[in-house]
């Protein structure tokens, strides 16, 4: 996944973009066979909720049983890094340009929204997955579910 040259993003902004992307992406079952985002977002949310307590429990358990501190800390750090890996991946995905097959479908969905009377901001540059998430979220609110039949 390459990042477009005109949208430079630093390492820490990818986490923020990943969080925004996970909140924007519509969690619809009909999108799951085509896009991996549903699974990644679900697992990232799960990791954000459960990995910190698991890391603390693992650290305390290994120390209480007389284990060494090094492996205990390494295990806890690994558990804490899992949610960050998910957010980083989502941030990278949000700025990735759409492939040609999805790009055509993106413009079809935008056309259906405009035909329904929705005012959409013009697309600047090559659309990315964040633009797709915004468009899909709006389409699920405004259109009937038949717009997914072309997917």
Curated annotation (Swiss-Prot):
Organism: Escherichia fergusonii (strain ATCC 35469 / DSM 13698 / CCUG 18766 / IAM 14443 / JCM 21226 / LMG 7866 / NBRC 102419 / NCTC 12128 / CDC 0568-73)
Transmembrane residue ranges: 46-65, 69-91
Matches recorded under InterPro entries: UPF0208 (IPR007334)
NCBIfam families per UniProt: PRK01816.1 (NF002493)
HAMAP family for the chain: UPF0208
Family from the record: Belongs to the UPF0208 family.
Keywords: Cell inner membrane, Cell membrane, Membrane, Transmembrane, Transmembrane helix
One Gene Ontology term, aspect cellular component: plasma membrane
Membrane protein topology class: Multi-pass membrane protein
UniProt-recorded name of the protein: UPF0208 membrane protein YfbV
Subcellular location per the Swiss-Prot or TrEMBL entry: Cell inner membrane
Cysteines engaged in disulfide bonds, as pairs: none
Main localization (coarse): membrane
């Amino acid at each position: 996944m390459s990042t477009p040259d005109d949208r430079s993003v630093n390492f820490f902004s990818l986490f923020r973009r990943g969080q925004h992307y996970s909140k924007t992406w519509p969690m619809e079952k009909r999108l799951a066979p085509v896009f991996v985002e549903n699974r990644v977002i679900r697992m990232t949310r799960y990791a954000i909720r459960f990995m910190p307590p698991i890391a603390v429990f693992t650290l305390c358990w290994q120390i209480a049983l007389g284990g060494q501190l090094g492996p205990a800390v390494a295990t806890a750090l690994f558990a804490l890094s899992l949610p960050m890996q998910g957010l980083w991946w989502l941030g990278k995905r949000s700025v990735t340009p759409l492939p040609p097959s999805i790009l055509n479908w993106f413009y079809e969905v935008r056309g259906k929204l405009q035909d329904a009377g929705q005012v959409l901001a013009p697309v600047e540059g090559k659309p990315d997955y964040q633009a797709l998430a915004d468009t899909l979220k709006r389409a699920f609110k405004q259109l009937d579910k038949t717009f997914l039949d072309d997917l």
